[in-house]
Amino acid sequence: MAMTGVVKDELSRLTVLKPCCRKAEVSTILRFTGGLHLVGGRIVIESELDTGVAARRLRKDIAEVFGHESEVLVLSPSGLRKGNRYVVRVIKEGESLARQTGLIDSNGRPVRGLPRHVVAGGVCDAESAWRGAFIAHGSLTEPGRSMSLEVTCPGPEAALALVGAARRLKVHAKAREVRGVDRVVVRDGDSISAMLTRLGAHQSVLAWEERRMRREVRATANRLANFDDANLRRSARAAVAAGARVQRALEILADDAPPHLVAAGKLRLKHKQASLEELGQLADPPLTKDAIAGRIRRLLAMADKRAADLGIPNTEASLTPDMLVP
């Protein structure tokens, strides 16, 4: 299954208990996939989704959080549409649901951005809004030069609101228009991982990061094949291995590592091909080669000790056979 499908499936099965979060997720899904129709003078709400599990989740939340019944229609593949599509439709009391979810304002006019209770809500509401937006119209590409997490939005106002929600989650996202379609894009690999973690797609993050690391190792191996100097090959391979160990060390220690050691480790992660001397120059304030090496060494030692105490894999467990070749 492609990464987009993996993430959507995991998010659609995620258990969310807080009513405000469920409300924010439903409101965003309806805003990004829904259509308001007047049928016989009454408002009917339709939301088209690409998986059955997402449709069942939406229908369940509409009933449990808002108290409205809905029906699910299955649209068979046709034209460019390869798979089934699932339409969740609310016919009875559609106007009431539209007001509850913020799709229309007090005067009955459609809301163009995200509903007020989502925009003005807490961090958990921002997370839920992004989760709903991704379930509705999100995509995740494979790790590589053009990797991205992207959401197609119903308009520029909704796109800007989603960028604002990402900012509250401390994730950098950009709104852009491509061929008349508004999109919000997260491109940086670390930002993509952070966003997926925020949304609750923990298994998907692990799978995506594994593919990302494999690609980096392969790319490094390809560069190494062109190196004439054996010392340069060993140094580059050691840098990649050190980066993998540092990543694992930061996961083990979480918030318990001293800030100056964390800073040294993050420098190594950000500049995996840099020499120790170059890393020292990038530090603030600049450090000597021995000083930066010592900090990284202490970070790894502290993490390995913590791993031994907890009985979990240490930093060397993150190394792959490609990294161990002399």
Swiss-Prot record:
The keyword Disulfide bond does not apply. One of its GO terms (molecular function) is DNA binding. GO terms for biological process: cell division; regulation of sporulation. Pfam families: HTH_WhiA, LAGLIDADG_WhiA, WhiA_N. The keyword Iron does not apply. Keywords: Cell cycle, Cell division, DNA-binding. It comes from the Bacteria. Residues 275-308 bind DNA. InterPro entries: Homing_endonucl (IPR027434), Sporu_reg_WhiA_N_dom (IPR018478), Sporulation_regulator_WhiA (IPR003802), Sporulation_regulator_WhiA_C (IPR023054), WhiA_LAGLIDADG_dom (IPR039518). Involved in cell division and chromosome segregation. Belongs to the WhiA family. NCBIfam families: DNA_bind_WhiA (TIGR00647). This is Probable cell division protein WhiA. It comes from Thermobifida fusca (strain YX). The gene is whiA.
